[in-house]
């Protein structure tokens, strides 16, 4: 199973131990729309919160250095976005994560 497949399974099942195993300790998630960067613990807390519901997930590319994934993501506030994720890997774990998102009509 690929790193992104493991991450997706952990996120979708809200398995904190598995999320922790997938993410590098020096992980950084850049949230361009909010103008901030969140850490591993913040990303796991967000994943565990139930705010993220993913559908139609497709891994577009993945090798041992980078991965690209697309998904339709619905948030608890009712907003739905088409999200393109770019991740880098280090030591077999997700090291950096950036997303680009387009709002979808409700």
PLM ranges: what are they?
Residues 28-30, 34-106:
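A beta-strand edge to alpha-helix "cap/lid" segment located at domain peripheries
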Residues 10-12, 47:
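Hydrophobic residues in alpha-helical segments
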Residues 5-9:
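Amphipathic alpha-helical repeat scaffolds
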Residues 13-28:
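Short, well-ordered alpha-helical segments enriched in acidic and aromatic residues
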């Amino acid at each position: 199973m690929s790193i992104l497949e493991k991450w997706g399974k952990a996120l979708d099942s809200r398995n904190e131990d598995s999320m922790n195993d997938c993410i590098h300790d020096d992980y950084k998630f850049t949230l361009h729309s909010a103008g901030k960067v969140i850490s591993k613990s913040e990303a796991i807390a967000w994943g565990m919160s139930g705010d993220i519901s993913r559908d139609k997930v497709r891994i577009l590319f993945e090798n041992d250095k980078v991965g690209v994934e697309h998904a339709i993501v619905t948030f608890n506030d009712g907003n739905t976005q088409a999200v393109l994720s770019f991740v880098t890997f280090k030591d077999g774990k997700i090291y950096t994560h950036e997303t680009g998102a387009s709002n979808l009509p409700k």
